[in-house]
Structure formats: C-alpha cells, structure tokens
Design a protein with these regions (language model features):
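N-terminal chloroplast transit peptides
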Residues: 1-6, 14, 26-27, 48-50
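C-terminal lobe and adjacent flexible extensions of AdoMet/dcAdoMet transferase-like proteins
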Residues: 275-331
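Short polybasic linear motifs
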Residues: 9
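A short, ordered amphipathic alpha-helix with a cationic face
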Residues: 19, 258-260, 272-275, 286-289
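Catalytic cores of RNA-modifying enzymes
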Residues: 38-267, 271, 302, 329
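Intrinsic-disorder-associated, low-complexity terminal segments enriched in Asp/Asn/His/Tyr and depleted
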Residues: 18-19, 25, 37
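Compositionally biased low-complexity segments enriched in histidine and/or tyrosine
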Residues: 28-34
Length: 331
C-alpha cells in the first residue's frame, strides 16, 4: 500500500505563508479557533474560509484529554478536501473542540453531529454555532455512543465519521466504532503518524499489530498526508497524519445471516483479536489462554497448517479469521 507524506517545509511559498501567518501567534498563546466564514455564511469557497482566534477556554487546554487544537488554515483546507464526504451524509465529528473543522464539514454534509467530551468546550461550541442549521453539538464520550441508535434517530442507515483523535485513546475508539461497522460508510482521522503507520502496516512488519488488524478487517486504510506539530495549538511532540478508511465487508458477514448475527460475530472476533495481541512477541496460544484453552488454540493453528508457536503479529487478517472460526466450538 502506497504511503504518501507531505514534505515539510511546504513546497509552496503560499502554503508556508498561510501556515505561519495564521498559526504563528497562536503557538505563543493557545487559543481555540473557528472557521468564521464557514460558520456565518451559507456557502463560501474553501479557500475563503479562514481560521480566526475567538477565545481561550477559561482553564486552557486539558492535556489529560489529549487536546491539541488544529489551528492551521492551510491544513484544515487540505483535510476537508481529502475527506470523501457526500452531500447527503450524516457526519459524526469526534472531538469537535472549538469547532475548527465543524463548520467546514457542515458545508459538505447534510448534518454534522459534533461530539465533544469536554463539557466546557461543548457549551462554548453551542454558543458559537447557535442558529446554524445542520449542526448538532453533543456533549458525550464517544466510547458510550451507540451508532445504531444515532443513525436510527436521524433516519439514516450509515454515518461518516471524522475526528482529530486524542493519541492515547485511538485504539479503544476504533475498537468501539468497528463493533458497529455496518453503520459506518467511511471514516477519516487525524492521528499520531506512528499510529497511522501501525494502522496501515502489513503482516510480519514491525508496526503490524492489533490496530492494523482492527482497521484492515473492515476497511482499506491509507495515509493521505502528514501534518507537522506546528499546525496545532499547543503543538504536540510528534508529527500527525490524516488516515482515510474506505469501508469493506467484514469476514463475519455470511450469506443468509441476519444483521444481528453478523454484529455478534463481529464483536466476538474483535475481542478475539484484542486478546491475541494482548502481549507483543508472545505466542498466540498464550495470549488467548484467558479466553480459550491453550491446547485448543495450538490444535486449531496446526489444523490450518500453521506452527503451534505462531505469534499473532505473524498472521494476516485472513489467517486470524480462520483460527477464530476453528475455535468457535472450543469455548
């Protein structure tokens, strides 16, 4: 899978100027920002949407919540242009913050549900977007959000999900979302670049692991471009990247099976994968011992022509599914 990164410094003088003039002063004083033109106008070209500081949260950003606000107008435009949102989409935005992306997403979609865990930021965002059609601010933990219920309440079958994800909670968020994969049309996330490499890694490579299998079971994931620390306020210690996910059918989907049956199998398989990668470089049988008898795991992998000492990181998504299927009767 091809991986494309944006060179830094930017090759375009205009891009560099846009980045430093819109962000430089914000790096000295962390501030929340909003796309002024996108919020206040019916429709403006993306190039005309500029980020302008509106206020600081009264207590500043909260490091424990992994808050790094996207403050670069140049990269915000690139992200919106790269995210495959359709005009009739219901978009769920994870970690809306101060709305740096919310207005721009709403210009492309039918409706945006901006989910923000921080009650202070959610309240401020409601005030800023008061009266703006097509945007709903929801103060909630994404890990407690039921996508099926959300889609049902908005009269749609699927949703598109976007987020600038807190680096420390990327895996739990993906695990939670993919339990409801049939309700997701597509996804795009800004994540730590190291995490992006893990998501797109192939079996047997150093970055390959639980995140790789999690993403690749239900999507074709690719890195769109990288984002430097200076595009955020406060700047993180690492580079970030935009990763897009084109959803595919999962291995659990069987002809004639009901959606409920598929969902149950999907959840069991995701839990199986999580257990299989519980400790890196440990044998699959040992990692799964809390869920399945170790002898049953070894017998299952040997029946598939694999070594009884195999590790999860050596197996492809298809291999892991075969092992899971072989173990179905051993619990």
């Amino acid at each position: 899978m091809a991986t494309a990164f944006v060179p830094w410094p930017p090759p375009s003088p205009a891009l560099a100027e846009d980045h430093f003039t819109s962000v430089g002063h914000l790096l000295r004083v962390p501030a929340c920002v909003r796309p002024v033109d996108c919020v206040t106008s019916k429709m403006r070209p993306l190039a005309a949407c500029a980020l302008t500081p509106i206020h600081r949260p009264k207590t500043g950003h909260r490091p424990k919540l992994g808050q790094h606000f996207l403050t670069s107008a140049a990269f915000r435009r690139r992200i919106v242009e790269a995210v495959p949102i359709r005009r009739n989409d219901l978009v769920v935005e994870i970690g809306a913050g101060c709305g740096a992306m919310t207005g721009s997403l709403a210009e492309r979609a039918a409706r945006v549900v901006a989910v923000e865990l921080d009650s202070r930021l959610a309240d401020e965002l409601r005030k800023e977007l008061a009266g703006r059609e097509g945007i709903e601010v929801l103060q909630a933990d994404i890990l407690g959000l039921d996508l099926a219920d959300l889609c049902r309440s908005h009269g749609v079958e699927q949703t598109f999900i976007f987020g600038n994800l807190p680096y420390y909670i990327t895996s739990p968020i993906l695990h939670h979302l993919l339990k409801s994969a049939r309700h997701i049309r597509g996804m795009a996330f800004v994540v730590q670049r190291e995490v992006a490499l893990r998501i797109t890694a192939g079996a047997g490579s150093r970055p390959y692991g639980y995140l790789s299998v999690l993403a690749q079971c239900y999507s074709k994931a690719r890195i769109a471009f990288s984002i430097p620390p200076g595009a955020f306020s406060p700047p993180p210690a690492v580079h970030s990247a935009l990763v897009t996910f084109e959803m595919t059918g999962g291995p659990e989907e069987e002809e004639g099976a009901s959606a409920v049956q598929d969902d149950l199998r999907r959840r069991k398989f995701l839990d199986f994968v999580k257990a299989g990668f519980a400790q890196k470089r440990k044998k699959l049988a040992n990692n799964l011992s809390a869920v399945y008898p170790a002898d049953a795991v070894r017998d299952a992998v040997r029946s598939l022509g694999l070594s009884g000492n195999v590790r999860a990181e050596e197996l492809t998504v298809a291999d892991l599914w075969r092992v899971f299927e072989a173990l179905n009767g051993s619990r």
